[in-house]
Amino acid sequence: IWIYDEKYKEYIKKAKEHGLKLAFRVFFDGGVPQYVYDAGAGRSGSQPYYDDPIFQQKFFKFLDAFAKEYNNPDLVDYVDAYGLGTWGEGHGVTLKNNTDATYKAVIENITGAYAERFSRVLTVMNLSWNDWKFTEESVYKKGILPRRDGIGSYWFNDTERKYLHQLFSEDKLAFIGEGCYWFNDSSNGSKPGYTYDFKNDKRFQMNTMEEALTVSVNDALENHSNTLDLRVPTQCKFWIERLPGEVQKFITNGGYRLYPARIKVDRQGNNMLIQHSWRNYGKGMLPNNHPSWNHKYQLTFSLL
C-alpha cells in the first residue's frame, strides 16, 4: 500500500528537502494491489480489466485518499489523469467488454474521477493517436492538458504532432513534454544491444548522447512544450555536466515568459486609463484556462 511503502516515502521526502515540486502518474500495469483481485476484480495478464466495476470501486477509493494528500498546488505541479495500459501510456488497454463505447466510458470515468478530486492541481493525459477519437472531445475539450513522452524521437509521430499543434493553437492548451527515454544509456551510444537506441531513430539523425539530448531540447521548443524533464539520474548527471547550455536554453525559452510590450497611462480628471499589451517570450503557454486554475492569475496594477 502506497502510504506504507518506504521507497515512495523516501522519494517524497527527498523532493521536499530539495524544494522540488511533485508530479504523479499512477499506473496499473503490474501495479494493482493483490487485495483488488482478491475482492473479485478481473484481470488480463499484468493489467486489470479497466471496465470492471470492482476495480473502479477500489481505485476511486484510493484516489479519494491520494487526492486528499496531494490536491495541493504548493506541493504538486500536475497529475496524470489516466495511467491505463502499458507504462501508463494508454497502450494495450484491457477491457472485459472490448467495444468503442466501453473504451470511451472508461476514459471518461477515469479522467473525470481525477478532474473531480484534483480540483486545484493541473491534470494531464498522455496524447496518443490510438485513442484520439475519444480523447479529443471527452478529455481535451474539457481542459485536461496534453502530455507526451518520446520528445526528440520518431515515437512522437506526425499524426500526434498535428493533434498537439491543434490543441495548442485552437484550444489554447499548454503542453507537458517528456524527453525520450534512451534506456539509461551512459555509454554515449557506444554500448551495443539497445533495440531502440537513438542511433536507430527513424526521424532524427543522432550519433552521440549529446546530439540526442540536444535534439530533445529543439523538438520540445518547436512543439511549444512547457516542460522537458532531465529524466533518470544518469541522464540528469549527463545533462548538467555535458550540456549545461542546452539546459539553460530550455529554461530560457521553454514554458511561458510574459513581459509588458506596451503600457500607456492617460489621466482623465480623477480617473486613469491604462492601456497595455503583453508578449510571451517563451514557446509554451500559461495554462490559466485549465479548470483547476480557472483563470486564477489576474493582471493588476499598483499605484505607488
Question: Could you tell me what each predicted segment is?
Answer:
Residues 289-304:
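Extended low-complexity, serine/threonine- and proline-enriched intrinsically disordered segments
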Residues 1-44, 103-122:
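Aromatic-lined substrate-binding rim segments of carbohydrate-active enzymes
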